[in-house]
Amino acid sequence: MPKNSHHHRSSSVNSTKSRSTESTNKWKIPHYYRRSASGSTQASPDRNSSTGSCSTPVLPTMNVMSSPKKVLLEDPRDNHTKAKKSSRKKSGEMVFVNYTVQDTANENDTDLQTQPVSVPAPKAKLKKKSSKRRMLKIFGSSKNEHIEDIVEEQPMVLQMDSESKPLSGTPISESGIDASSLTTKRSYNSFLKHNRLNGKTPFSGNLSFPSLNMMGNTTDLPIDNNDFCSEKEVVPKSTHDPSLAKPPSRFTESETNSTPNLSSIPLMNTKNTRLKYNKVAPQSSDRQKSQESGLYHSTESFNFKDQNYSNNKSSLSLNSDLSTPHFAKHSPDSPRTSRSFNCGDSQSKVKLPEENDASIAFSKMFTRKRANTGGSTCSLASPTIAQTIQQSNIKVNKLPTQRTTSVGSLSSMSNRYSPIRVASPGRARSATRGSSLYRLSRDLNSLPSVTDLPEMDSTTPVNEIFLDGQPQHKSGSVKGGHRKKQESISDAQRIQHSNSYITTPSSSLVTPPYYMTGYTLPSSASASSTPNVLETHNMNFVPSTSTVTSYRPSSNFSSFDKEYSNENDASGEFSAFNTPMENIPALKGIPRSTLEENEEEDVLVQDIPNTAHFQRRDIMGMDTHRKDDSLDFNSLMPHGSTTSSSIVDSVMTNSISTTTSNATGNYFQDQDKYTLVNTGLGLSDANLDHFIRSQWKHASRSESNNNTGNRVSYSGSTPNNVDTTKTNLQVYTEFDFENPESFFHEQSKLLGEMGHSNNNSNSAINMNEPKSADTYIGNISPDTSATVSLGDLMGSNVSNNSERNFYDGHTFVPQYQANSSVENSNNQNAAPIANNDIDNNLQSFYFDNSN
């Protein structure tokens, strides 16, 4: 019966108190919780023998779950049929909880009386039952079951019985040691709970209120507790109350000094007790002090009770001993006082049914609050999370205009709007899913333009924005779990740009948000609707087809001073959002505005002063933005570096300087401005051969039948033959001014080859150019594999001396930008070569390709 021995530990303690033949089956904390006890032997030999015999054969055969029930039932049967019956009923009631059972010996016939009254401990030792019965009477018979239940919940109940017994009749020393220790367990549950419930009853009032009241009312108590010589005790108590109060107060002070926190802590020990004693305090400071001394001991034990019941016994016995000399003649009452207060503490504790050993252990194991990953209602209701949400809202409302906003900065909004990340601000950048951070941008259309923070002004009802609003045009491929709660900003934009047509993206494509340009880009970062690097750029600066050009403020050049930036911080911050190069082949073309802005972004990285606009050419081939002739090219281009950004590198090149061959497979089909960028990486000798050759070669696939004549014009002049139906291929050419020959050496032959390869093409030269330089034009045809050689362009007709005059040691990489007209049915290209003022160190070649 090792199992029973564990269970019977408290029973052994009880047996020490009351030595009765009958054993009581008491429920301890959940069965898994066992107190280690030296083979606790049941005080009743009959019980022990019967239980031993019954439990020993039964336990090995029985399952752990069922064993406590069977053992309990059999044991009471073996001892006494009556007691067995009552214990069976109660044990059966308990068993459903699957708790373990303790066997304790009770003494007197009173147990028989008490058994029907107290459900859990009907088997309690006769004297225990009698004492318990008395206690129950004091508390009120109606609440006996309650008491027992609570006691059952907490293993201290058994000691409660023993406690009541020593209170009734055990000597001071005995009560001080065994009775008090037992009292700690037992008294906590039954006494306190019932005191609270029946505060009006005289004894409960005594327990709950200061010791003085208890002393004065001891007459009531002796009636209930026959064992106590209450009458004798009552008079001295009442008389000595004030005197007793003083020494205890001194004692309390000394005790408090020695252990300054204990006396105060008991009062603070539990919420209920704290309130209770605070209320009592005004009645009599002396009383409370005397009480405090008792409380000090009792509470101390009670504190230990929370920590460990075994400690409670020793501490409680010490308490009773300590309190005894202070109460001198009334030593039997001092343990009672401490017990009563202990009961008060336990009562408050018992008030919370979950406060049992199991709950305490569980709370100790799980002290931390779980992180709110799911955004449950409770978590949202918590003040901290509410504050976090408010802060996030404030962030959303107060997005600083001077701050560079990026997709990464949307995390502040994601906390509020993201259906997944409802309110877990600590996990703004959760890596659970590549695009989980951007779930808020299920469709960034619903957000105001991330980079156009001017729209985030007070005029924009930011709080009204719902990130999960799905634009109606989105295909069903995007998860339909998000419902549009209101008209999103993107819808308003579409209404404004009603003339812009929108293509429904496939599952792998995402319509560039906010500005619907009529074409879709593959979301290379993820298959979800999260915009990738290109899309985020396109989102704000790709004009709709109705808008011919996109004007970009010059303030974008400074990465710190810029009012807003189209730079996608996510690409830099999150490697997951760097455009995978394996997805590049899916790109049909890159919007001109995107790469042009990327070029500018490199300039931003270089901290180039923002003094100029890139020249944008509309479908007519005319400059939509005035370009300063006095503009210094240094203001536009990074010194000794390239204009391409890492984003462009990843998008356009598989290797650093090699442009993906199929990136422009349908170069002219989307009918918008495109840009191809070759990254020279600041090489003094940039190989334009591969770049120009491959790009012209692939660009020509869509119009292999069009061998166009080439015209050259300077930006200040309009091409001789302005054909609105022809797309303008805009080229910004940059090269090493210090080493022009080396820079153009490889291309010199290729240009000639290209010029000779197109014999059927007409070449026209627009001589509206400064007299300071000659312009050479070769036949540049998209279908040829030849490379435009600036060396030939510059070297053939422009003197090297004049070139060297404006070589400033900067390496430039050409940027090809196709301006496709809406009416470009023939896919014809006009690429004027424009040389701005060479004296101003700025060269731009515009190649007009026309039939």
From Swiss-Prot:
Dosage dependent suppressor of PKC1 deletion and MPK1 deletion. Involved in cell lysis. GO terms for cellular component: cytoplasm; nucleus. GO terms for biological process: G1/S transition of mitotic cell cycle; positive regulation of gene expression; regulation of cell cycle. Residues 1-10 have a biased composition (Basic residues). The keyword Phosphoprotein applies. Residues 11-23 have a biased composition (Low complexity). This is Protein BCK2. Residues 1-91, 233-271, 315-355, 466-504, 698-722 are annotated as: Disordered. It comes from Saccharomyces cerevisiae (strain ATCC 204508 / S288c). Residues 37-66, 254-271, 334-349, 489-504, 702-722 have a biased composition (Polar residues). The modification Phosphoserine is found at S334, S757, S761. Transmembrane segments: none annotated. Keywords: Phosphoprotein. Residues 71-81 have a biased composition (Basic and acidic residues). The keyword Phosphoprotein applies. It comes from the Eukaryota.
